[in-house]
């Protein structure tokens, strides 16, 4: 089942942004606390930036320890606040090479759909492989290329006893410009096979236990046929 209300997802993982947490335009923004450093999963659209930072502080965490933001894809609700985080905290932006141009130019970000402006942001760490690792203090974050929603969509997987999947926009949609339904089918199968205990979705909450995670992912996979 999905759950909401608490900012805590699991040990060292928190939701600090989202439609009901920071601003209606924001995707779900997660922070992973690795002790001496932290990593954000996505940045939100920008309108809720200050509240996201306040939410981090309310957890007793110091946003000054943010090392990086992993941008799961190049849509405005996920990347709009990248420049704000970089300017205030000096974070690195991490993204897949196939979405880098969109992040650095804003073309295809969908900012016009939300009626907001986007400040293009340089990508510091460009991911090129099918699977790479980002170190976050005591945690290793596995970053997985899952094209479909966008060419450079990525998911983040953390196995620290409890297996947590930051699948982000598992729900799609997969009919937008740049989307690819056939790639999405392969990507969703791959996510289901990770057998995660917890799914942190990009807009629709946190799902657990693992049976519910698989049911959610496979339900969206079936919708593509």
Label every PLM stretch briefly.
Residues 47-51, 57-132:
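Active-site HxH/HxHxD metal-binding segment of metal-dependent hydrolases
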Residues 3-59, 155-170:
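Conserved beta-strand hairpin/beta-sheet module of binuclear metal-dependent hydrolase folds
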């Amino acid at each position: 089942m999905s759950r909401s209300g608490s900012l805590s997802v699991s040990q060292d993982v928190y939701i600090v942004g989202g439609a009901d947490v920071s601003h209606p335009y924001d995707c779900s923004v997660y922070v992973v606390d690795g002790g001496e450093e932290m990593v954000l999963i996505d940045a939100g659209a920008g309108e809720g930036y200050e509240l996201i930072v306040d939410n981090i502080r309310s957890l007793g965490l110091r946003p000054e320890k943010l090392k990086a933001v992993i941008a799961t894809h190049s849509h405005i609700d996920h990347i709009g606040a990248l420049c704000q985080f970089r300017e205030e905290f000096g974070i690195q932006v991490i993204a897949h090479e196939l979405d880098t141009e969109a992040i650095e130019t804003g073309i295809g970000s969908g900012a016009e759909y939300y009626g907001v402006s986007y400040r293009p942001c340089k990508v510091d760490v460009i991911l090129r492989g099918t699977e790479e690792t980002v170190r976050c203090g005591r945690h290793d974050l596995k970053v997985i290329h899952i094209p479909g929603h966008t060419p450079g969509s990525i998911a983040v997987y953390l196995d620290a006893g409890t297996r947590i999947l930051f699948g982000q926009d598992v729900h799609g949609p997969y009919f937008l410009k740049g989307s690819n339904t056939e790639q999405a089918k392969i990507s969703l199968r791959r996510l289901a096979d990770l057998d995660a205990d917890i799914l942190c979705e990009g807009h629709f909450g946190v799902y657990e236990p693992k049976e519910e995670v698989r049911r959610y992912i496979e339900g969206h996979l079936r919708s593509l046929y």
